Amino acid sequence: MLKILVNRKTFLTILILTGTILLLSDRALPAKERRAPLPSVPGYVAVPVHYSHWNKMMMEAVVNVHRARFVVDTGAGYSILDAGRAHSLGVSPVGADSPYGEFANLNGVRYRVGYLNSLRAGAMDFGSGPMALFQPASEDAALNARINGENEDGIIGADILTRYKAVINCYTKTVFFKTGSSEQLHVARFAASQNFKRIPLREEVSRAFTVPASINGHSCRLLVDTGAFITTFDLSRAKEFGVSFTNTRMSGSFADGITRRVAVGNVANLKIGDYQVPPQRLAASVLPDFAVDQGQAKIGGILGMELLAASHGIIDFDSMSVFFK
């Protein structure tokens, strides 16, 4: 049965950085390439994903027998469907007498709720159920930033990913969804045999997911966000940690609707858990307050898609771990 959390508020932040991928072009991901056959794992269904030109992790799906494209987004607390495309996908808003409620309250904004008779991705059958219908022209900049510019139909968010104990292999471009109650993928055992570093993944009060990190020996946490195509530090915090950045002409349009300048700098001493990140150029900007305000967590920035893939990242929502090598 497909369900969605319709009352939980989440931070949802991603920046759209025009030109940043060109400046950091060595970190861009190939959109399409030949892939190995999908593995067969008892108790799990493997679904292929691919990267778009903007490093978004895309999953091909079928909604009510109609083909659709979804962004796989660990930074989105809930899954949504573009209201403008709902009709062509055979999805209509539910009525006032619906047991799921006529409206969903997401990020303080009310959205109509639609009912999906079926949602499938590859061999994975998510079943039927309600999903919030997002209006891109609405005032919710957070969602608008995430479902914009890639011709996608919606977002597969943390509600579905955590419900099915998803294991996201960012390097092999495969997502495993758990369908059996007793089987376990034992990612940690495999990762240890392949010299991966295991990093604990923590859910914050806002339903953001973070990992421990350090910059020049200063402890912080990074938001794990497959919806962010570029790793971006909070500029003030990075400077506080002794990292120098050079201003550029580029700007970023953030989830709070404010456009900010983007800086780039050489980061030589970044550790994520026990994993030492190779020295490289990374971006920084003044991140929105709701991105860095995660209760007691001291957020240093957003861990984006390019670094997750380059580090052979595996995100395991079963053991609540991230693995790098």
Locate the predicted segments by residue.
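Pepsin/retropepsin-fold aspartyl endopeptidases
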Residues: 2, 7, 23-325
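Bacterial N-terminal signal peptides
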Residues: 13-22
